[in-house]
């Protein structure tokens, strides 16, 4: 079921998203390098709770962490452990925030100061995809297949590979709502964007292969053959004249 949000609901969701933006601004690479993932997870939890909000992912479907911290070969859904975030690493922070029942789900990727140039280029390409190909597709009555196809075409033309098994989704009242928004698809297929939709769009991109596997903890989604990967997630509100990005 697709939940079309009222103006009051969008206002509440924006408050949750404002906390995400504060998390992203505060937790810079300089603050996090050298820390264990479990420490980073707790620091973000404390920051969110100081804003009178909760970590939405904790306990969701049994998830044991507070936030998804995906280091290096982990693409998404990483559970924080004792591993230290080092200068050569990639760390994706996927943050779920529950502010009095209004939800934000968004992610950003950080690279250490000694990250491989290929990882740097990948992150730049993923971040630029939002303004170059995603946002031009965000308008009322556009089929979601057009958005999915635009994402697929952009990344495949650059020689990248996309995670096929996971995608974006509706959000705001529940963590995962309809519609499913895959990062691949055919034009003119799927439901059409409607005014009042709040959606998460999240390219999950790899350099060498689209193959993934599940870690022994049944949470961390790992690359199987790809050396580098990147995941960025933004939330959008579809309006009568286009969109609002709620998380950037």
Swiss-Prot record:
Keyword terms of this UniProt record: Aminopeptidase, Hydrolase, Metal-binding, Protease
Binding-site residues for substrate, renumbered to this chain: 77, 176
Cofactor, how bound (note): Binds 2 divalent metal cations per subunit. Has a high-affinity and a low affinity metal-binding site. The true nature of the physiological cofactor is under debate. The enzyme is active with cobalt, zinc, manganese or divalent iron ions. Most likely, methionine aminopeptidases function as mononuclear Fe(2+)-metalloproteases under physiological conditions, and the catalytically relevant metal-binding site has been assigned to the histidine-containing high-affinity site.
Protein's recorded name: Methionine aminopeptidase
GO molecular function list: initiator methionyl aminopeptidase activity; metal ion binding; metalloaminopeptidase activity
Superkingdom of source: Bacteria
GO CC entries: cytosol
UniProt record similarity statement: Belongs to the peptidase M24A family. Methionine aminopeptidase type 1 subfamily.
Catalytic reaction annotation: Release of N-terminal amino acids, preferentially methionine, from peptides and arylamides
Functional summary from the UniProt entry: Removes the N-terminal methionine from nascent proteins. The N-terminal methionine is often cleaved when the second residue in the primary sequence is small and uncharged (Met-Ala-, Cys, Gly, Pro, Ser, Thr, or Val). Requires deformylation of the N(alpha)-formylated initiator methionine before it can be hydrolyzed.
EC number(s) recorded for this UniProt protein: 3.4.11.18
Binding, a divalent metal cation 2: 105, 169, 202, 233
Coiled-coil region(s): none
Sites where the protein binds a divalent metal cation 1: 94, 105, 233
Organism per entry: Mycoplasma genitalium (strain ATCC 33530 / DSM 19775 / NCTC 10195 / G37) (Mycoplasmoides genitalium)
Cofactor(s) listed: Co(2+); Zn(2+); Mn(2+); Fe(2+)
Root EC class: hydrolase
Quaternary structure and partners: Monomer.
Gene Ontology annotations of biological process type: proteolysis
């Amino acid at each position: 079921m697709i939940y079309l949000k009222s103006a009051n609901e969008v206002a509440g969701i924006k408050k949750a998203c404002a906390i995400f933006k504060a998390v992203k601004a505060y937790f810079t690479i300089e603050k996090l390098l050298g820390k264990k993932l479990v420490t980073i997870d707790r620091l973000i939890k404390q920051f969110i709770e100081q804003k009178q909000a909760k970590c939405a992912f904790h306990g969701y479907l049994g998830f044991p962490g507070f936030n998804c911290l995906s280091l290096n070969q982990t693409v998404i859904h990483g559970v924080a452990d004792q591993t230290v975030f080092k200068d050569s690493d990639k760390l994706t922070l996927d943050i779920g925030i529950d502010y009095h029942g209004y939800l934000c789900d968004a992610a950003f990727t950080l690279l250490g100061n000694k990250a491989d140039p290929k990882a740097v280029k990948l992150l730049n390409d993923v971040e630029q995809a939002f303004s170059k190909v995603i946002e031009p597709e965000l308008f009322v009555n556009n089929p979601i297949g057009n958005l999915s196809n635009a994402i697929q075409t952009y990344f495949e033309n650059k020689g990248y590979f996309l995670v096929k098994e996971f995608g974006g989704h509706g959000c705001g009242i529940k963590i995962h709502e309809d519609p499913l928004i895959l990062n691949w698809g055919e034009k003119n297929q799927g439901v059409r964007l409607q005014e009042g939709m709040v959606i998460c769009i999240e390219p999950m991109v790899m350099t060498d292969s689209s193959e993934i596997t599940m870690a022994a903890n049944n949470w961390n989604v790992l690359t199987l053959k790809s050396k580098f990967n990147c995941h960025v997630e933004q939330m959008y509100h579809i309006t009568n004249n286009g969109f609002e990005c709620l998380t950037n």
